[in-house]
Amino acid sequence: MKPIRRKEWADLILMLAIFIGAFMRFNPTLLAGFAINDGGMFAVMVDDLNASNYFLPKFTAYNHLNIPFAYPPLGFYLGRIAADLFGISAVQAVRWVPAFFASLSIPAFYLLALRLLKDNYYAAISTLFFALMPRALSWFVMGGGLTRSPGQFFMLLTLATLIRLYEENRRTDIFWAGLFGGLAVMSHPEAAVHTFVSAIFLWFMLSRSRTAFINSLAVGMIVLLISAPWWVAVIHYHGVEPFLKGLATGQKVLAVFHLLFFVFTEEPYATVIAILGLIGIAYCLARRDYLLPLWMVIPFFVEGRSAAGPAAIPLAMLAAIGLVDVVFAALSTLRGRGGAAKIEALVEKARVATEKAGRSDVQQSDQLSSIERNVFIYLLLYLIFSTYQFGFQLSNATLYPPDQEAMNWVRENTPAEARFLVLTGTTSVSCDSVLEWFPALTGRQSLYTVQGTEWIEGANFNSYVKSTYPVQECLSSADNSCLDMAVSRSQYDYVYVSKILHSNNCMPLDIQRTFPYFLESMRADSGFDAVYESDDVIIFGKQ
């Protein structure tokens, strides 16, 4: 067989990463036939822009709560443009735009990896791990990815440009980093936080020069200028209060345990990428190369709720280093004589090495070895299967057709001012498609839908979320008096019940849950009357 050069292999890997990764990002919504999980509020906000002729509205119509339209609006404008350009509904825009920008993030990641690792072979393998790491795609391809995926895309471009600015001092990069950074800020609040913190960290690790610091200040001024139309309008309408309340809802202290147990890759079977990442961490620490390990840890202490997404970026690079510099190098060494001694020498060489300008020091040949080729082919096939299976499971976290039909009935047959108590039995408000999509598809108010309330509740947001759990737990009760203890009947006009719980925490249940005893008690209650019923949904109206 003709020898394969590493450059040719790297080009092939990159091409596979981009195309297979894009397929994996579009596949869940293709399988579901609807947006994955969330995005109901965002669909309404896309329609709000249509009603306001693209001017930033003061409030969103979602759930009739006068929620300030304070969310970074770039994703909504992208959704509105896609809807108008292709003649699709806001719901369809929320379905497709996230997967599109999540796919664009793959080549953007390659650019960042190439700037950091200084070698296209390592960068290409890193990109493949990023493309096929479940956590690098899951929350970005959901309906809520309308803002998350552009935020991820522009964050990657910002950091890649900043690295070149710090290392090469190109003046044009000040403009481009400011532009991309401004678009990241305009996309998602957590993307703004992680971009800002990562930029400071990279400056500290790569430069620490006065010139780079001044350039960073110039980038920051451009970011403020680019994002000014949004935050100036919000301050004009509402003052700074929505921003203060939004900032008070972040954090998740327990997220650090995801780092401790190294489970945040969300791989459904063998955690291959996580294990290779751990090997890469050990190797980098032995070389006293702390940039990637520290960068992976920082998000969990800055913004724990969303830490896994940005942590996946350095982890993918660490996994590539672990695979090439440790696994491949050890296997190649074992083929020769005195394998154990050579491995020991290799480890010692790694420990004392301090060269950071590139990774060519550990490559013995420009030719790809048969071991590398065979192991890589196996890893590729396994990761494709694993990621496809994850996407298949993720496709179950969607709004099922019976719920869509029931919500259409609600829109057409109930008063516009009607208030609904929506019961699904889920234990995660962030993975409850019915609760979030109900106000969007019906135009009616849902009492315990939490989306958007972070801009109203502020520091009380987490307490408000916890207050929704007792209501959902009533579905497991055989006595509907549980409901009366959780919420007064005067607060709602109808009770919407999903009879079957298909998935929980965004993953399908092995055994679907039903709630026959609760439904029987509701039917027996003279205060309620079933006004709509199908095999999957029942709606009770108060007598």
Describe each PLM feature range.
Residues 99, 303-335, 339-346:
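Hydrophobic/aromatic-rich transmembrane helices and adjacent perimembrane loops
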